[in-house]
Amino acid sequence: YCFQKINRPGESDEGCILDGKLYPFGEISRTENCYRCSCSRDAMRCCTLFHTPVGYNKEKCKVVFNKESCNYDVVQKDDPSKECFVYSRV
């Protein structure tokens, strides 16, 4: 998933603002919220670093976002210490 945020005139002379945080002009390999971005005077273009699991046992498993790894973990509802098999992500 990717998006673009157009910078308002005079919004910042030092970089781009995303989710209340200032990022410098240029390439940002990872934001606080797990996006890879490019910041220019005109706009900020970002894409997610994570893929959303869609193919897994939804009855026995649940999805939990892991901000440290910038990915979704799919774990057993009964025992979250055990991972579930995921056969497709988008």
Curated annotation (Swiss-Prot):
The keyword Disulfide bond belongs to this UniProt entry's keyword annotation: yes
Metal-binding among keywords: no
Subcellular location: Secreted
Disulfide bonds: 2-16, 34-70, 37-46, 39-47, 61-84
GO cellular component, one term: extracellular region
Modified residues (Valine amide): 90
Name of the protein this chain belongs to: Beta-microseminoprotein
Species classification: Eukaryota, Metazoa, Chordata, Craniata, Vertebrata
Gene: MSMB
